[in-house]
Amino acid sequence: MKTILITGFDPFGGEPINPAWEAVKTMDGYTDGDYKVVTQMVPTIRYKSVDTVKAAAEQCQPDFILCVGQAGGRPDITVERVAINCDDFRIPDNGGNQPEDEPVVDDGPSAYFATLPIKNIVNALHQNGIPAKVSNTAGTFVCNHLMYGVCHYAAQKGNIKAGFMHIPYLPSQVVDKPNQPSMAVETVRATSVSYTHLRAHETLS
């Protein structure tokens, strides 16, 4: 049986919840065909985020890693194409770190592209009635940091494919944020189910 490690961040930026972890946490132990899901909550802290995912990966030995993060203000599920080797945090992370124009990995490549089939994932979500699109920027906060760090780790391992998905706010988060888009947690959770099903029942690179 092959393993998909799916991660979600803890709350940050003054929010009481993070839709990424709310959606991901119930997927732990989920199976479809020859694939099983392992989940991991990730701290929204610069280096600790990557270290947490690496530790989980060393334990469960995944074939694929899908990291999930919140992107408040985006109306769709956005599957990230690329992570850049730059930490430029607009606000402090949960550890109080706020680097400016610093590398994620010293002497690392300028960028890493996701090695998951991003357009196939978007198409699978569309087929399940979920609004989604490819995104060409993961920002420069901890989401980009994690995507870059995990892709760097996967490249070093050589046998893991990795990527990142941003999700909108949950409805409860926008009660006091007029005109901000949101998406029900059940819909967000369905994205992980859709990806696992796609992986289990389609031929993907």
Where are the model-predicted features located?
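N-terminal catalytic or cofactor-binding beta/alpha core of small enzyme domains
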Residues: 1-138, 152-156, 180-191
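Single, functionally critical "micro-switch" positions that shape active/binding sites
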Residues: 7, 165, 200
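Short secondary-structure boundary/hinge segments and terminal tails
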Residues: 22, 143-146
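Short, solvent-exposed polar/charged micro-motifs at secondary-structure junctions
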Residues: 48-51, 144-145, 174
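Proline-centered helix-kink/hinge sites
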Residues: 62, 168, 200-201
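Small/polar glycine-rich anion-binding or flexible loop at a beta-alpha turn
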Residues: 139-143, 168-169
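Active-site-adjacent mobile loop/cap segments within catalytic or ligand-binding domains
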Residues: 147-193
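Single conserved hydrophobic/aromatic residue that forms the stacking wall/gate
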Residues: 197-205
